[in-house]
Amino acid sequence: MQHQMKKIRLLFAAFVATLLATSCTQYNFEDTGLANGKHEKSMWDYFGEDSYNWDSLRVMAKRADLIPLFQGNSAYGKDFTFFGPTNHTIRRYLKKNSLEKVSDIPINDCKTFILNGVLRKHMMLDDFKRGTKSTDVSTPIGKGGEMFTMASGRQLWIYSFQEPYNNVPGTGPVQIYLVSPTTTRTSHVGSCNIETQTGVVHALDYYFNLNDF
């Protein structure tokens, strides 16, 4: 009887451990309404099919003559990563700057805002090095991670970090963070690993501002 009870306890412990592991790793993104996954289409067409999140970005791309970028017909090819600002971010920028519509944003600004988010290599969530945020008030750059030069020439320190789950460190979802040495602001990816035929998209969360990079 004692042996049987011990076996039951072991089976229960294994079940709980499996359940916890599944709960921790099922999602690596916030619920921003963007589904991560693989899409058999160009990044440009993917944006076009989700007007709720991306139609403002498409207007910016047209103004900046960057449609070929998202179609895979530019110097960046079909193997790049894009940290994309959603409509919420762009609408907030318009309101803050007293602009009525996206086409009122200066062309050069549209180009800079987009290229600030373009990384010239294909990088999924697991490709970003683990890191920890800075605890030094004199610098926004923490430990680990990696410094990248974006297509605009702007530098960003990017790292991944596994969040706690039920107050247990290192057991929750893995998130991507981006830190600008220029603005000292930290940004966060809301939905990651959106793969298209012309690159991978990591959607920035709704709190991101276009000037954060």
Can you describe what each PLM-predicted range is?
Residues 8, 24-213:
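Mature, structured domains of secreted/extracytosolic soluble proteins
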Residues 1-24:
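Sec-dependent bacterial lipoprotein signal peptides
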